[in-house]
From Swiss-Prot:
GO terms for molecular function: rRNA binding; structural constituent of ribosome. Pfam families: Ribosomal_L2 (PF00181), Ribosomal_L2_C (PF03947). The gene is rpl2. This is Large ribosomal subunit protein uL2. Part of the 50S ribosomal subunit. Forms a bridge to the 30S subunit in the 70S ribosome. One of its GO terms (cellular component) is cytosolic large ribosomal subunit. SMART domains: Ribosomal_L2 (SM01383), Ribosomal_L2_C (SM01382).
Length: 236
C-alpha cells in the first residue's frame, strides 16, 4: 500500500503547506480619512514577506500608525496625504475622480472602501485613461481596460521595487528562501521521478507513467493525478 501523495498532504493543511502569515507585516489597505484630507509622515520603509513590494510605515496626524504600499521615490520623512483634497504627487492617495487622465496609479480599489486590489506588485502600475459619466476607465498592468467607480481610491505613482525579476536567482538557495515565505512546497518533484510508494506514476526502471494519464472526475484521492477529466490529450 502506498503513502499519501503530496496533493493529499496539501489538502489536509499541515504546517509544511500553510502560508507563514504570522510573519506578515499587515493587511495593506488605504489610509482611512474623514473629511477631505488626512496627512502623515513616512517613519520607515521595510520588507514584507507577504508581498514583493516594500511597505512604508506612516504616522498619521492623530498619532496612529499604518502600513501602506511604498511607491518609487518614497523616502523616510516624506509627507503623504490621503483624500480628495490631496496634492497630485507620487505617494498620495485620492479618489479616481480627482486624478487627471494619463496619470500612473497603483493599489487601485475595485469597489469604494475595499482597500485596493489592482496593481500592487513591485514595479507595476495602471494608467487612468479617461473619465466618463459615472465611471472611470483604468488600464491595468495586464492591458485590460476596467470601468471603475469614480469614488474608488488609488495611489499616484509606480509601486516600488521595480526590476526585481531582472535579477537572476543564480542558485537554488535563493529560490529556497523565495518560496519559503509563501504557501508553496519547493522544490516540486515530478511524479515519474518518485518511487512507486510515493506516486501512482512512480517506480519502474525508467521515468514513464506506466499507465494512462487520464483519470475520471470521480477518482479517489491518491489516484487522482495526471490529466483529470480530460476532454482530449496530446498536441493540438
Amino acid at each position: 500500500m502506498g503513502k499519501r501523495i503530496i496533493s493529499q498532504n496539501r489538502g489536509k493543511g499541515t504546517p509544511t503547506y500553510r502560508a507563514p502569515s504570522h510573519r506578515y507585516r499587515a493587511d495593506i489597505k488605504h489610509i482611512k480619512f474623514s473629511g477631505d484630507l488626512v496627512r502623515g509622515i513616512v517613519e520607515d520603509i521595510m520588507h514584507d514577506p507577504a508581498r514583493t513590494a516594500p511597505v512604508a510605515l506612516v504616522r498619521l496626524e492623530n498619532g496612529e500608525k499604518q502600513y501602506v504600499l511604498a511607491t518609487e521615490g518614497t523616502y523616510i520623512g516624506q509627507e503623504i496625504a490621503c483624500g480628495p483634497a490631496a496634492e497630485i504627487q507620487p505617494g498620495n492617495t485620492l479618489p479616481l475622480a480627482s486624478i487627471p487622465e494619463g496619470m500612473p496609479i497603483c493599489n487601485i480599489e475595485s469597489k469604494p472602501g475595499h482597500g485596493g486590489q489592482f496593481a500592487r506588485a513591485s514595479g507595476v502600475y495602471g494608467i487612468l485613461v479617461a473619465h466618463d459619466v459615472g465611471a472611470t476607465v483604468v488600464q491595468l498592468p495586464s492591458g485590460e481596460m476596467k470601468w471603475l467607480n469614480p469614488n474608488c481610491l488609488a495611489t499616484i505613482g509606480v509601486v516600488a521595487g521595480g526590476g526585481r525579476t531582472e535579477k537572476p536567482l543564480v542558485k537554488a538557495g535563493k529560490s529556497f528562501y523565495k518560496y519559503r515565505s509563501k504557501a508553496v512546497k519547493w522544490p516540486r518533484v515530478r511524479g515519474v521521478a518518485m518511487n512507486a510508494v510515493d506516486h501512482p506514476f512512480g517506480g519502474g526502471g525508467r521515468q514513464h507513467p506506466g499507465r494512462p494519464k487520464t483519470v475520471s472526475r470521480g477518482t479517489p484521492p491518491g489516484r487522482k493525478v495526471g490529466s483529470i477529466a480530460a476532454r482530449r490529450t496530446g498536441k493540438r
